């Protein structure tokens, strides 16, 4: 059995078309959804991510402002810019690209963003809302993963979901989202004693560690759904995920590829969050 692919590019195109339609409806009312992207320093990967986010906004009817500052920018100066964006009525979402230079406290900066403009879903108010099941902005990557499961009509009720990774950006919010859909959730991490024993019980596996081949074919039960959040490079320098794709695709029922899986969905859900922020006006 070869797994069916969950195509993140195709699903993104569908969702972005809907974003563009809703953005046009807002513009007809005199509201252009606006995203401010703040980049500090010259991290090459961050520059690529930021360009992709800005382009996605422009391609789908959203207004995007890129503020690029030198790495020497002080924490106080960055906080002042965030406060100014909080008070800008043309901006509905604020994204501060991580990582930040070492002299800037990323937590302090994220907490300075107004919760109503926290379209990355990283603010403690967003995390708390997710925890207790209240409306709020969901972090874009796990939100995209949930949309992928939804796209295949997968009913999570009563299913065992294993999340590999416990980051605040993916692992923890992913577990909460799965729990909201009535899955039984296990979170695995670097101190988990027998990862294979856990994953072999799983109906759904989300790999979000940032380490190649953390999930191999012998760790997956036949027919399981495998979501690969990882972004790594193999020995040839090619993009790969956390999952041994070639092996696991022969066992799993569904699998997401890297590239072309979760990656495009992350940016798409950023657009959705920004749009929904503007629609609340």
From Swiss-Prot:
One of its GO terms (molecular function) is methenyltetrahydrofolate cyclohydrolase activity. It comes from the Bacteria. Pathway: One-carbon metabolism; tetrahydrofolate interconversion. GO terms for cellular component: cytosol. Keywords: Amino-acid biosynthesis, Histidine biosynthesis, Hydrolase, Methionine biosynthesis, Multifunctional enzyme, NADP, One-carbon metabolism, Oxidoreductase, Purine biosynthesis. GO terms for biological process: L-histidine biosynthetic process; methionine biosynthetic process; purine nucleotide biosynthetic process; tetrahydrofolate interconversion. It holds the Pfam family THF_DHG_CYH. NADP(+) binds at residues 165-167, 190. It catalyses: (6R)-5,10-methylene-5,6,7,8-tetrahydrofolate + NADP(+) = (6R)-5,10-methenyltetrahydrofolate + NADPH; (6R)-5,10-methenyltetrahydrofolate + H2O = (6R)-10-formyltetrahydrofolate + H(+). InterPro entries: Aminoacid_DH-like_N_sf, NAD(P)-bd_dom_sf, THF_DH/CycHdrlase, THF_DH/CycHdrlase_cat_dom, THF_DH/CycHdrlase_CS, THF_DH/CycHdrlase_NAD-bd_dom. Its EC number is 1.5.1.5, 3.5.4.9. Gene3D superfamilies: Leucine Dehydrogenase, chain A, domain 1 (3.40.50.10860), NAD(P)-binding Rossmann-like Domain (3.40.50.720). HAMAP family: THF_DHG_CYH. Homodimer. Catalyzes the oxidation of 5,10-methylenetetrahydrofolate to 5,10-methenyltetrahydrofolate and then the hydrolysis of 5,10-methenyltetrahydrofolate to 10-formyltetrahydrofolate. Belongs to the tetrahydrofolate dehydrogenase/cyclohydrolase family. This is Bifunctional protein FolD.
């Amino acid at each position: 059995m070869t797994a069916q692919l969950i195509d993140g590019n195709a699903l993104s195109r569908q969702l972005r078309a809907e974003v563009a339609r809703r953005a046009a409806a807002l513009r007809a009312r005199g509201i252009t959804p606006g995203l401010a992207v703040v980049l500090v320093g010259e991290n090459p990967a961050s520059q690529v991510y930021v360009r992709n986010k800005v382009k996605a906004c422009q391609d789908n009817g959203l207004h995007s402002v890129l503020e690029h500052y030198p790495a020497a920018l002080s924490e106080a100066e960055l906080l002042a810019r965030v406060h100014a964006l909080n008070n800008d009525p043309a901006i509905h979402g604020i994204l501060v690209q991580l990582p930040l230079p070492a002299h800037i406290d990323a937590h302090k900066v994220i907490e300075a963003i107004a919760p109503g403009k926290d379209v990355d879903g990283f603010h403690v108010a967003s995390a708390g809302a997710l925890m207790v099941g209240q409306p709020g902005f969901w972090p874009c990557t796990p939100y995209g993963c949930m949309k992928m499961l939804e796209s295949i009509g997968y009913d999570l009720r009563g299913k065992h979901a294993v999340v590999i990774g416990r980051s605040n950006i993916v692992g923890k919010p992913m577990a909460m989202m799965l729990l909201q859909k009535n899955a039984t959730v296990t979170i695995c991490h670097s101190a988990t004693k027998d990862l294979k024993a856990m994953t072999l019980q799983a109906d759904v596996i989300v790999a979000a560690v940032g380490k190649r081949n953390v999930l191999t074919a012998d760790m997956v039960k036949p027919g399981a759904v495998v979501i690969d959040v990882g972004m790594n490079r193999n020995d040839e320098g090619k993009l790969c995920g956390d999952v041994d794709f070639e092996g696991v695709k022969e066992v799993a029922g569904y699998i997401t590829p890297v590239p072309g899986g979760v990656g495009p969905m992350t940016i798409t859900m950023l657009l959705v969050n920004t749009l929904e922020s503007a629609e609340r006006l």
